[in-house]
């Protein structure tokens, strides 16, 4: 599975990528919204984990832009946020899921495993 991790915390993004690669996935990293959009225009991802708080804007706006692009319309996009109050709110409707930080290794492994299951 091809996974993109978008997080402005370099150490977190790199750790997520290392875990994914250790589980046999291909992992790429972007640290801001512009880089994420650029990566998605160059290749197709099966899963994008997208931080809400990015230095160049809101991850929700990046998600909306990705949903409009031909490259990521059907890609599973999961929000990463430190704000527990955002999980389940209507402003997160473009996302396929939401995980509240901090994320445990087990939660990341579970998410990657679930993303490999075809959607119904």
List where the protein language model places each region.
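Alpha4 helix (beta4-alpha4-beta5 surface) of REC/receiver domains from two-component response regulators
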Residues: 61, 83-99, 110
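Hydrophobic/aromatic residues positioned on beta-strands within the core alpha/beta folds
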Residues: 78-80
């Amino acid at each position: 599975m091809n996974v993109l991790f978008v997080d402005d915390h370099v150490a977190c993004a790199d750790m997520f990528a290392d875990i994914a690669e250790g589980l046999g996935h291909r992992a790429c990293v972007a640290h801001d919204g512009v880089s994420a959009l650029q990566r998605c225009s160059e290749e197709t991802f099966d899963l994008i984990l997208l931080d809400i708080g990015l230095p160049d804007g809101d991850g929700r706006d990046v998600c909306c832009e990705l949903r409009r692009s031909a490259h990521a319309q059907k890609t599973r996009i999961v929000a990463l946020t430190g704000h527990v109050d955002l999980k389940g709110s209507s402003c997160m409707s473009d996302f396929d899921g939401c995980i509240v930080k901090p994320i445990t290794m087990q939660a990341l492994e579970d998410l990657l495993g679930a993303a490999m299951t075809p959607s119904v």
